[in-house]
Amino acid sequence: MAVLTGLTFGGNTWTPKFAESIDKDKCIGCGRCIKVCGYPVLDLKALNEEGEFVEDEEDDEIERKVMVVAHPENCIGCQACARICPKNCYTHNPLEN
């Protein structure tokens, strides 16, 4: 199977790996990843005590917030989010044809 690769400015080959998922059990919702990402890829979502996503931000059942890959189509594959994550929550994979 073919994998998307590119060349760096220096002529080295580079295989971008795109954000696929974030482990909600590991994520602490610190927001470092969304600050370092220059593209609208991530979003902070609320979880209730059962670990289910809550749509209503005013809901009293909100336990905590975690980051999610809301728009994977906007990811450029730089992995800056994974490098800055203190809890190693990210799963990245190369783009395959």
Curated annotation (Swiss-Prot):
| 4Fe-4S ferredoxin-type domain residues | 18-47, 65-95
Sites binding [4Fe-4S] cluster 2 sit at C75, C78, C81, C85
Cofactor(s) recorded for this entry are: [4Fe-4S] cluster
The lineage is: Bacteria, Bacillati, Cyanobacteriota, Cyanophyceae, Nostocales
Q: Name the Pfam families on file.
A: Fer4_7 (PF12838)
| Name by which UniProt lists this protein | Ferredoxin-3
Q: What functional role does this protein have?
A: Ferredoxins are iron-sulfur proteins that transfer electrons in a wide variety of metabolic reactions.
Entry's PROSITE patterns?
A: 4FE4S_FER_1, 4FE4S_FER_2
Question: Which GO terms label this protein's molecular function in UniProt?
Answer: 4 iron, 4 sulfur cluster binding; metal ion binding
